[in-house]
Regions:
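Juxtamembrane helix-boundary/capping and inter-helix hinge elements in multi-pass membrane proteins
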Residues: 22-27, 52-56, 63-71, 190-198, ...
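Membrane-water interface regions at transmembrane-helix termini and the short interhelical loops
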Residues: 19-23, 49, 88, 92-100, ...
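N-terminal hydrophobic signal/anchor transmembrane helix of membrane proteins
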Residues: 1-28, 117-126, 131, 219-223
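Hydrophobic transmembrane alpha-helices that form the core helical bundles
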Residues: 70-102, 250-267
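Hydrophobic, membrane-embedded alpha-helices of multi-pass small-molecule transporters
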Residues: 1-14, 146-152, 159-222, 234-256
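Transmembrane alpha-helical segments of multi-pass small-molecule transport proteins
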Residues: 4-5, 72-79, 100-122, 136-146, ...
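Membrane-interface helix termini and inter-helical loops of multi-pass transporters
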Residues: 94-99, 152-162, 223-233, 294-297
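Extracellular loop-to-transmembrane helix junctions
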Residues: 18-49, 70, 206
Length: 298
């Protein structure tokens, strides 16, 4: 579980969100990130703990409060929003990848979509070695990215005085990311042998890594004067390393969205197989990312 949630935390979306906090300055921005993640991760923990103790997926736990019909409504809505998340994440990842190697965003949509399908086909329980290698690579590459931002960036930084961001809004943005995993986390804690420890490990790992991503984004905007991570990495000459960060961070995060859409579909129609639906969701998300412009909703 820890590796899965490490992958969820390493995300281009979280880095981009971190850039919005730059007008607060590093110290106040970091305080907002920490407070927001403590609030969000507490709620994330209890949501995951319910599923872990009951041995039920996220949408099955909803039925405990809203009944069978109410649970069906939430399951349908959850599938729809996870399809949307899958499309948006693929779109963002493809744009970032195309900013490094200009081969066309649609090419990267297909590459990212294919890798997500591979992740789902292998299955959560069989991802051990693949995840270990992918997470180790991402860990090393993100440290390299930190060095570029915090040690090779401009000492003058960017003029962000014209941008408005209240402390409360920054806390809200920091709460948003862990909160977004509430309809998903139980899908990955339901089979835990030690519910409290497994859920705590998942949430702590995610919370720490998510804070790290926010800080990378915020630091990028403050110290380099640039909010586009792809441009920062390209200027630093990271090349293939930059591409690997973008692609694998997108895959390891979006995989959870697509797979959980499949798990939620099982709450609607018991005969459906979650991994099969997850693959279909990935295909739909990939096609949507290629066809529809999503700049205004990312």
């Amino acid at each position: 579980n820890g590796l899965i949630w490490f992958g969820a935390g390493v995300s281009i979306a979280e880095i981009l969100t971190g850039t919005y906090l730059a007008p607060l300055g590093f110290q106040r921005g970091l305080t907002a990130v920490i407070i927001g993640h403590i609030i969000g991760c507490c709620m994330m923990f209890f949501a995951g703990l319910i599923g872990a103790r009951m041995g039920k997926s996220a949408m099955e736990t909803v039925k405990m409060s809203f009944g069978r019909k109410g649970g069906l409504l939430f399951a349908v809505l959850n599938v729809l929003q996870l399809v949307g998340w899958t499309a948006i994440m693929i779109y963002d990842g493809a744009l970032a990848a195309d900013g490094i190697f200009h081969t066309g965003a649609w090419v990267w949509c297909i590459v990212i979509g294919a890798l997500i399908v591979l992740w789902i086909a292998v299955g959560v329980t069989n991802l051990g070695k693949i995840n270990t290698i992918a997470m180790a690579a991402l860990f090393i590459l993100t440290i390299l990215l930190c060095r570029v931002i915090f040690f090779d960036g401009s000492d003058e930084g960017a003029d962000l005085s014209s941008d408005a961001m209240s402390f409360g809004a920054a806390v809200e943005l920091s709460v948003a990311m862990p909160l977004s995993w509430l309809p998903v986390i139980s899908d990955y804690t339901r089979e835990a042998e030690k519910p409290v420890k497994a859920t705590a490990a998942s949430v702590i790992v995610y919370g720490l890594v998510s804070c790290w991503m926010y800080v990378i984004g915020m630091g990028a905007a403050i110290y380099t004067g640039e909010t586009d991570i792809a441009i920062i990495m390209a200027k630093a000459g990271l090349g293939i390393a930059a591409l690997l960060i973008v692609i694998f961070s997108t895959v390891t995060t979006t995989f959870l969205d697509a797979y959980s859409a499949g798990v939620s579909s099982e709450s609607i129609f018991a005969k459906l197989k979650g991994n099969h639906v997850g693959i279909v969701v990935t295909v739909i998300g990939t096609i949507a990312a290629i066809i529809f412009p999503m700049d205004d909703i990312t």
